[in-house]
Amino acid sequence: YKHSMRLCNEIYSTEDASDETLGLFSTWDFDLSSFQQYAVEALHLGHHVLVSAPTGSGKTLVADAAIRHSSGHHERVIYLSPIKALSNQKFDEFQKKFPEKSVGIITGNVCFNPEAEVLVMTTEILRNTLFQRQMVMEGSLEKGQVDLHFEMDIENDLSKVIFDEVHYLNDPDRGGAVEETMMMLPGSVQLIMLSATIDKPEKLAQWVEGRQTNGDRE
């Protein structure tokens, strides 16, 4: 795709939506807000999604949609949180919401079901795994020298990565892990970024669309 950013801050017009998109909206038994409609449509079309909306406005639905509309081990989803406590909370939540899917969690001291379709982890876990994997590919490390937290065919099996609280990108302590993770992910992976407090979200969107010259998302 040609890289292009679309700012979706107006009322969503269902008159322009396809029947397939309207069918996706009807998955829920309530009317979606405009930003939720824009996000669900963009997810379906394979675009990166950045949602900046107040706490309690329904950002969680966007993450749920990304998980709900992924299927099987060739469309695995990784959900990233900045802190372990939130990872534990989301793991419990996803197990209840998606009983039909396998859900796993990896934190500093817990590794449960790492082969799952939906993996919850802290950002540092994915960053460290991608970094070691990159060093093996470059020949800086032998495969036997690394201790990966999980095994996955990132290029072929990973469909989406959800960055919860993506405003941590601006945090002096944790921001590096978020940025490095985004940089190391293949362009084929769809990014879903959620935040209530991010400053100037359009700047982040512009950075994301330009971060991977070999990517095929917009």
Please identify what each model-predicted range represents.
Residues D29-E218:
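Conserved P-loop/Walker A NTP-binding site and adjacent catalytic elements of P-loop NTPases
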